[in-house]
Amino acid sequence: MFNVRQLIATTLLLSCAFAAQAERLKDIASISGVRSNQLIGYGLVVGLNGTGDQTTQTPFTLQTFNNMLSQFGIKVPAGSGNVQLKNVAAVSVHADLPPFAKPGQVVDITVSSIGNSKSLRGGSLLMTPLKGIDGNVYAIAQGNLVVGGFDAQGRDGSKITVNVPSAGRIPGGASVERAVPSGFNQGNTLTLNLNRPDFTTAKRIVDKVNDLLGPGVAQAVHGGSVRVSAPMDPSQRVDYLSILENLEIDPGQAVAKVIINSRTGTIVIGQNVKVSPAVTHGSLTVTITEDPIVSQPGAFSNGQTAVVPRSRVNAEQEAKPMFKFGPGTTLDEIVRAVNQVGAAPGNLMAILEALKHRPLQADLIVI
């Protein structure tokens, strides 16, 4: 049914006519079932320079340490539960197991302190099994940590901390022990899931694949998925997908969005965001000053000294210019106009909040 050589020749001919704005199919969609899996584990980091957990406050660290020693035939004497270990820290370990990972391959891991360790710098992670959501062990982690931050403290109590010393990474620190079953080679169809569901993009993918391979090869399931017929032979399926994923697709225009972060003042504006005719915004500053006074009773009186609150409330309306825009004005033009008069990001966010109720022709997302 599928001739790989003919597909390659046809793809090369069609690629010359693709627009410069087009994107590869692999950049806008993923194959259903081809995904990474999260792994997590719990272990110990040893060899710390006195920056480990205070085990009197984190009993689980000491319990884990004792369990590890018991596996080597070492029994901790009774009554030593309050021993202080300064060079050991309990940590969580997590990693992403990439698709098609096989036993013997290595993956990067992230190690994070879960106790009160001050720093993991200089530590080594002991053998830690990494489990999936199904409870099976898929990898074994061990190795020396690479920590980007550090912590220093003087005798007078002054201290300095750079970045985050309580977390680190081990490149290639986990060895894969079990492969995750994949349904990639099952069935005679494959499903392409769009990273950003869009009906226009889904239709253009269907049209592009059918123009290349023939009618009915690709069918849109909905705005987020496209189902394509595929060879049954695994090697042909790989060649087939290598051609499909390099097809140039012109994606549909995304929905106009404005994203604002009220905590940081960050504003992200999408393309072609337009507003209706007029906008005006003023700046009102309300100042409340607390100036309590002390009421002192006279001598030999039965009165008591009391604090009497006294507040002054002052409202100031700054003389800000009125902004007026014509129909079809883009939000980018509004931002430039607001910035020219020296308005703060908070004023711009207030304008965007007001525009949300009617004139703003876009989705306003506040994070």
From Swiss-Prot:
One of its GO terms (biological process) is bacterial-type flagellum-dependent cell motility. One of its GO terms (cellular component) is outer membrane-bounded periplasmic space. GO terms for molecular function: structural molecule activity. Coiled coil: none annotated. Keywords: Bacterial flagellum, Periplasm, Signal. Residues 1-22 form the signal peptide. It is found in: Periplasm; Bacterial flagellum basal body. HAMAP family: FlgI. Assembles around the rod to form the L-ring and probably protects the motor/basal body from shearing forces during rotation. Belongs to the FlgI family. The basal body constitutes a major portion of the flagellar organelle and consists of four rings (L,P,S, and M) mounted on a central rod. This is Flagellar P-ring protein. It comes from Pseudomonas putida.
